[in-house]
Design a protein with these regions (language model features):
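Periplasmic-binding protein-like
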Residues: 133-136, 149-151, 209-213, 219-220, ...
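Fungal secretory targeting signals
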Residues: 1-18
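Extracytoplasmic "Venus flytrap"
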Residues: 17-34, 44-62
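A bilobed periplasmic-binding-protein/Venus flytrap-type ligand-binding module shared by bacterial periplasmic
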Residues: 153-160, 266-278, 297-301
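Short amphipathic alpha-helical coupling segments at ligand-binding clamshell hinges
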Residues: 63, 208, 268, 277-289, ...
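Extracellular/periplasmic juxtamembrane helices and adjacent flexible linkers that interface
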Residues: 288, 292-361
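A ligand-binding cleft/hinge motif common to bilobed small-molecule-binding domains
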Residues: 110-114, 234-256
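Extracytoplasmic ligand-binding site segments that recognize negatively charged/polar headgroups
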Residues: 49-65, 77-87, 91, 98-235
């Protein structure tokens, strides 16, 4: 078995290649207007295929409809699946030299530098790339960059918890009113949630986690699921800190941020595959994503020159109790990630339930 594994690894290495000593990462810098790129994309066929990390099939329907309304005649075929599965499927396409995807947007930030070094990504700077925070992009090749800041917030239903006026810390969740009221994503099933627990427990220790377990939280798969359950009247659970709903997630839902440990934020990262079948369509999509027009609609912009929509703070870099640059380093340290997964799996058991894409929650 070990000999076969060695042969497989050597074969994989022989089929991959490294661009470092090629000294050829200079990007194409876009100078055309959106309208000019739009007409080029229509001439190409008007189709874009995007794989976007997420845990609900319809999670990017708003992006699809907004884009298609903005650019009549364009079809945005967008598939949502867990980033930890999509990256492997992309590797398979690259291995087989059979790329069918134009654009990828994923949470697995550790993949992008590797793909860039393998020569799998298009070195291309959309208009607005120069405005993106340096920490959120490959400044040399322009092959990848964040397009929106994702983050976990504290969220609760004010109708279900009428006596809770504010939640200002993770320690608050150990109070009696939250007994049987919490719904949380398994940390051993999502690396961004894993990082949330890691950051919290670096400050509050395992004593906090022991106390949290005594509150009998409901553990679920997927990060959209907790907010869905919190929002729905037919579930008793009424608070979470492992979901992303922006600053105004819905009626009767209040959002707050902790003061006793950092919350997780990161730039959800995008790239165009070098052998994308619809390169002009992909360029249109990425220029739109980094445009001021689109960036003004997201909760927290990746651009330095745009104030965040709905945030009490001017930008992500001046938001207290978070550091959007550290998640990428965490994701690169797969040894630590695996050790933490097993720690939580030992305490909680393996993640139970159907994939969040098909569980109808």
């Amino acid at each position: 078995m070990s000999r076969l594994l060695t042969i497989a690894l050597l074969l994989g290495q022989s089929l991959a290649y490294d661009t470092v000593l090629g000294f050829n990462s200079h990007p194409l810098v876009e100078t055309r207007s959106l309208d000019e790129i739009y007409h080029a994309a229509l001439k190409e066929g008007g189709i874009i295929t995007v794989w976007h990390g997420g845990d609900e099939k319809d999670q990017q329907e708003t992006l699809k409809s907004t884009f298609e309304d903005r650019f009549p005649g364009m079809t945005l075929n967008i598939t949502v699946d867990l980033s930890k599965y999509l990256d492997g499927k992309i590797d398979q396409q690259l291995y087989n030299n059979d790329v069918s995807v134009d654009s990828i947007i994923l949470q697995t930030l550790q993949d992008f530098p590797r793909w860039q070094q393998e020569g799998a990504l298009l070195n291309y700077a959309p208009v607005g790339f120069d405005k993106v925070y340096p920490a959120f992009k490959d400044s040399i090749s322009a092959s990848w960059y964040g397009y929106s800041i994702f983050f976990w917030s504290i969220s609760w239903n004010t109708e279900k918890l009428p006596n809770v006026k504010n939640i200002s810390s993770y320690s608050n969740f150990l109070e009696p009113e939250f007994k049987n009221k919490l719904v949380l994503t398994y940390p051993n099933d999502d690396d961004a949630v894993l990082f949330a627990f890691y950051q919290i427990m670096q400050q509050l220790g395992t004593k906090w986690f022991d106390g949290l377990l005594k509150q009998n939280p409901r553990w679920v798969r997927g990060t959209a699921t907790p907010l869905t359950i919190v929002s729905a009247a037919n579930y008793s659970q009424s608070a979470t800190f492992t979901s992303f709903g922006g600053f105004n997630p819905g009626q009767n839902i209040k959002v707050a941020f902790p003061n006793d440990a950092n919350f997780v934020s990161w730039p959800q990262t995008a790239a165009i595959l070098k052998n994308a079948p619809h390169p002009e369509g992909a360029k249109l999509f990425h220029n739109y994503l980094l445009s001021a027009e689109y960036q003004q609609t997201v909760s927290l912009s990746v651009r330095q020159d745009i104030k965040s929509s709905g945030s009490p703070y001017s930008d992500i870099m001046h938001t207290p109790h978070t550091n959007p640059t550290v998640f990428a380093r965490f994701m690169e340290d797969r040894v630590t990630v695996e050790r933490l997964r097993f720690f939580f799996e030992n305490r909680l058991g393996s993640a139970q339930g159907l994939s969040p894409l098909i569980d109808d929650i």
